[in-house]
Amino acid sequence: MNRNEILFDRAKAIIPGGVNSPVRAFGSVGGVPRFIKKAEGAYVWDENGTRYTDYVGSWGPAIVGHAHPEVVEAVREAALGGLSFGAPTEGEIAIAEQIAEIMPSVERLRLVSSGTEATMTAIRLARGFTGRDKIIKFEGCYHGHSDSLLVKAGSGLLTFGNPSSAGVPADFTKHTLVLEYNNIAQLEEAFAQSGDEIACVIVEPFVGNMNLVRPTEAFVKALRGLTEKHGAVLIYDEVMTGFRVALGGAQSLHGITPDLTTMGKVIGGGMPLAAFGGRKDIMECISPLAGVYQAGTLSGNPIAVAAGLKTLEIIQREGFYENLTALTQRLANGIAAAKAHGIEFAADSVGGMFGLYFAAHVPRNYADMARSNIDAFKRFFHGMLDRGIAFGPSAYEAGFVSAAHTPELIDETVAVAVEVFKAMAA
């Protein structure tokens, strides 16, 4: 009896779509989602008892591996002291200090419970600071599900965006301009036309939601230069990349100092925790110091903070990122080398994050990614899953390696990929 099928049917009878986040439903790959019963190290087990080598990593947070004993113990100790207080704690000061020490761009920081809250508030803060309404985002970049950011590109080069979700009024998105990622000419034209109306530019400094896409060095410099020139706020959305691609996030690799940074995933160690921070003069526009409002009952939850503090301690140990980066490169390069004749395939990685593309080349923007062979990805995904390897159930999602993976485990994964590619080419 397949417990996954039974649970999915049961879930669909009470939870819309049977899941609490759409990608989990396997809608883009077909089949029945795996209901996870437990996780440890580099593995997850479904309700049938089947073990999978996991490259989803809870979509990024599990950088030290699942159920790391030190993180679990930190959570246990914190829970014994109470689950939630709705009051300030020393732990939230400590984690803010830790993050600020690691990321010099963060002069002040506020904790929240989700990446969506972080980006939503960063946008509000940028608008409050500048007194402007318009924002720029890039096609294929995901910044959570707040109304002003659920926007797809308009029909013309520099038209303001249209809602990408039902239930979002057009008036909410009329101030959002959607441009092509890595397109400097569009960015320059947008500022030439509307520079004194643009409050901020929000960007994934390495994109993870149209698979892994790198920015060009020139694009990064243009982002910083144009926002500075026109008095707009540059927001680095490092919810995914923060502490994942490098200890100091993407901004440390780019040599860029953003005005605001949003972060999440890794900083909670697997618990619901996120943050936004940056320049003191911008951050001090927020309540209770000034008029930009933000609040949250569970913001700075002591259990999540305890998990985050222990995770931050672990990832700062000697050799952590060198090992993580080497493992991730070994995986990406190994799978790319394993591709069968006649199958277009490319791979890339940065830090502990990787992208697998059924395309001739690594994509540079959403249009490139949209031209990849989605049907081939579906076959690859299920071929790997049936053999005990779990990747994200969408061609548009990046993958993640943890410190719990080993070279031997990576090589086993590559060997399975060889089998799957051969089956696909047959």
UniProtKB/Swiss-Prot annotation:
Q: Which reaction does it catalyse?
A: (S)-4-amino-5-oxopentanoate = 5-aminolevulinate
Q: InterPro entries this protein is in?
A: 4pyrrol_synth_GluAld_NH2Trfase, Aminotrans_3, Aminotrans_3_PPA_site, PyrdxlP-dep_Trfase, PyrdxlP-dep_Trfase_major, PyrdxlP-dep_Trfase_small
Q: Which GO terms describe its molecular function?
A: glutamate-1-semialdehyde 2,1-aminomutase activity; pyridoxal phosphate binding; transaminase activity
**Pathway named in the protein's UniProt entry:** Porphyrin-containing compound metabolism; protoporphyrin-IX biosynthesis; 5-aminolevulinate from L-glutamyl-tRNA(Glu): step 2/2
Its subcellular locations are:
Cytoplasm
The protein's UniProt keywords, in alphabetical order, are:
Cytoplasm, Isomerase, Porphyrin biosynthesis, Pyridoxal phosphate
Origin, by domain of life? Bacteria
Question: What does the record note on quaternary structure?
Answer: Homodimer.
> This chain belongs to which protein, by name?
Glutamate-1-semialdehyde 2,1-aminomutase
What species does this protein belong to? Answer: Neisseria gonorrhoeae (strain NCCP11945)
